[in-house]
Every structure is written in C-alpha cells, then in structure tokens.
Swiss-Prot record:
One Pfam family named in its UniProt record: ABC1
Enzyme class: transferase
Protein name: Probable protein kinase UbiB
Membrane topology: Multi-pass membrane protein
GO cellular component terms given for this protein: plasma membrane
Predominant localisation class: membrane
Originating species: Salmonella gallinarum (strain 287/91 / NCTC 13346)
Catalytic residues (positions): 288
Amino acid sequence: MTPGEVRRLYFIIRTFLSYGLDELIPRMRLTLPLRLWRYSLFWMPNRHKDKLLGERLRLALQELGPVWIKFGQMLSTRRDLFPPQIADQLALLQDKVAPFDGRLAKAQIEEAMGGLPVDAWFDDFDIQPLASASIAQVHTARLKSNGKEVVIKVIRPDILPVIQADLKLIYRLARWVPRLLPDGRRLRPTEVVREYEKTLIDELNLLRESANAIQLRRNFENSPMLYIPEVYSDYCSQNMMVMERIYGIPVSDVAALEKNGTNMKLLAERGVKVFFTQVFRDSFFHADMHPGNIFVSHEHPENPQYIGIDCGIVGSLNKEDKRYLAENFIAFFNRDYRKVAELHVDSGWVPPDTNVEDFEFAIRTVCEPIFEKPLAEISFGHVLLNLFNTARRFNMEVQPQLVLLQKTLLYVEGVGRQLYPQLDLWKTAKPFLESWIKDQVGIPALTRALKEKAPFWVEKMPEIPELVYDSLRQGKYLQHSVDKIARELQVNHVRQSQSRYLLGIGATLLLSGSFLLVNRPEWGLMPSWLMVGGVVVWLVGWRKTR
C-alpha cells in the first residue's frame, strides 16, 4: 500500500470506530489478534452511543465522502443484505456536496469544446452552479445558435483518481467480510462492490447518459405521461452534457402540486404505468427514479405529465426475464405459490436441482402473511424483496437487472403513495401485465414473429435450393461413412469373437497340459506338447485383440 492509501485507510478505520461500527462484527467472530488490535485503539471510542446503529452507519458514510455516500445509496436498495432499520437509514443518504469552483467548470467546458471560449457557444453562462453532486455539477446558459435555455453538466475535475483509490480500499474491506460475518460468504461482498464499481464508472461517462436520455425521449415521444428533455448531442462529450432546461414542480413537493390543481390520483397512477411501460414495452427503464430526478409539468395539471432527468443509470430485461417477472406477479397475487416456485426454477434464477416442494413451502411461509393486508396496501417492491430473499436461501444467484428493477419499483411506489395514499398498484398494474402476457402468446404473437422474420427469410430464399443440394450431398457422404463404420464394426465384432474363442482354447490346452504333466507322467511328451500348443493358440488369440 502507498503512504496515501495507508493514510486514507487510517481515516476510514478511525471514522468507523468513532461511530461504533465495530458492533457490526459479532464478538464470536473476532480472533484474538483482532481483539487485541481493537483494545489497542482504546483512544478511538464510540462517540455516538446515543444513536442507533443504522443512523451511525449513515453518518459515518456521509463523513467519508461522495464515493461512500453513493455506495451506501446502492446498499440501501439491497435489502436482502441488511435488516430494515439499517436499509431505511441508508436510503436517507443525500448525494449533496459543496460545489467546486465555477471557473474550473468553465475551463473544463472550454477544453471539451476544442479550446474555444465559452461565449463562442453559449450566452448567459452562469458561473454559479444550479446544482452540485458528488460526480458532477450543473450550470445554466443559452445556446448561441438558437437562444434556447440549456443546462450544462460537467464531471468534477480529478474525480477519477479519488474514486479509484477509494474503490481499491472498499475491495480490501469486502474481502474481510466473509471472515468476520457469519453470513458473509452468502452476501457475496466482492460481487456487490463490483456491481457498484460498474455503476459508478458508467456515471462518469456523460456520453452514455446522453445516449440513455435520447433513447428514453424517443420511447416516450409525444406521450402525455412522461417528458424527457432534449439532449444537444453536438455539444456532448465524455465529461460534458448539454440538454434542454426544464421548469417543473418537484414530485416530492405535494403542497405545490395541490396548489397547482394537479390531479393527484391520475398522476400517481401514471407513475405506475410509466414504469411498467418502460419495463415491459421498451425493455429499457430509468433506474434512478428517486424524487430528486422527477418533476411534474406546470402545464395542464388536470392531465399531469412527469418530467424525468438524470438518466445515468438505466436497466433492461430480456424477453425471458420479462415474461417470468410478469407471470410471477400474477401467480403471487393469485396465491399460486407452486407456480411462483416453478417459474424461479424454469427461469434459471435458482439451480435446476432445487426441490420445488420445499421452495413452494418457503415462499408460502414468507408471502402468505402479506395477504393479511388489504390488496391496495400490498407493495410490489416488497413482494419482489420477499421472493428474492427466500430464493437466496435456495442459492439464487444475484440478478443485477432484477436488483435495479426492485429498487426502481420501490421508488415508484413510494412516490405514488406519497402523491395519492389510496393508490392501488395491483389494480393499476394487473390489466397492463395480463394484456402484455396475452400479447406474447397465441396467434397474434405468432403472426408478429413471422412478420419480424419475413425479411430474413425472403433474403435467404434464393439460397435454399443450394442448401438443400448441399444437405443431400452431405447426407450421401454421411451415409457412405456410416456404412463404412458399420462394416468396420462388424469386422471388429467377428475378430473379437474369434479372439475370445482362441483365447479360450489356448487356456484350456494350457491347463490340460499342466494337469497331465503333474498327474500322468507316464504319458511322456504329450502334456508338454499340449502346453506348448496352448501357449501358441493363446498368443494368436491375444494378437487378434490388438
């Protein structure tokens, strides 16, 4: 480790101990050297004994800085790893840090634009940031070409070395988790860190975020439900993104929405429909839909429209995952736990040798109490969480796309019920899911598949006669080869039969000669000749087996 890494590790350990986070490690798992090491740090006591463990963990991560804050935010979505009281506290982590100097942002923009001054491309550039987070910050301006208001998002300078250094230390700590926690190996800490690293590195590439925003905008073009601001691709680079500036009401500001006369019931239901449309129609969903990234248009409040920003994190499901997920939801709400268990096995989410009866019983035990609530109060996100937690006991592998989906679903539910507490998610989602499943099977689905494949088959049609001829010719050669192999096998079979016959005769002559030599010495040389003949016949038979 470099001196810088040692200093950083010391700061991390001091922070963890000052918040009493060594309580996360069961005493029985502390080896003697670790106990002595902890006692030697008596001058680093827990200074926050009045706070609960979850709150102390949240405060410690905030003190460690942006990389750890974002790590905590990601961990808050993995409720299979932590008890609710800790996961709830991690969900409160706010990715808000002090802005960096606007002059640095300006210099970075000029570098991205080929060294030209900012006013060559933008008017009214505001040196003061509109918003600031751990990875990037945003400035406002107007496009010189058309006068449109835009926001310019720039990556923090020199953030990559900081992220790489902290990730290296997080990996080191993750390797200790299986040794220190009884359930550490099942938690797969290294996989969790690897997943976080991928998400974080993706967020550093604003070209990726630009492409995501363009795709989402195209998917919801002219939609009354969701608006994605326009991205000005000509101005975008890996470290800079320029997009349309929007004005809306934060979705968390319920009072302002009500004051604007917003139809709250319709707004809440549209949030659910937007989510399921992204997942099942488009297979491409905004996976960071927390309240800070969602606004509501001021216009036509009786027909409200969401505005989505910050498309750095997206998720996608393949066709099989979508079908299994939809059927899982429907089977669960029909209380068909056998079907739920079979779907998990069929999808490959759990090993194929899983005992379906045991799995069904485990799902029933965990999920049946949920139905003690009214249907309108049942949380889709917690249904998924319960199913995944149960499946993990049966060695379900981590499915990153499903983890993202479950996190997003919890956000959508939370926002929806904040807007309209009586929101019945199942009533809103069931027709959508049933319609989607119906659309995937039967004559319409077959017709659609044939239409999709028709251009391919039309293109390949001229090649079919040649392919048939080649197949017939290959078949002829194959038949010739098969006949040849059959003849060789037959010859080998005859040879093996002869060999066994000769070996038997040789052994018989050898044994007979030996017997006569011992018991009938008066027979003279006859026994010896029998033995010699037996050896010769046996050797001939043995040679035929080679």
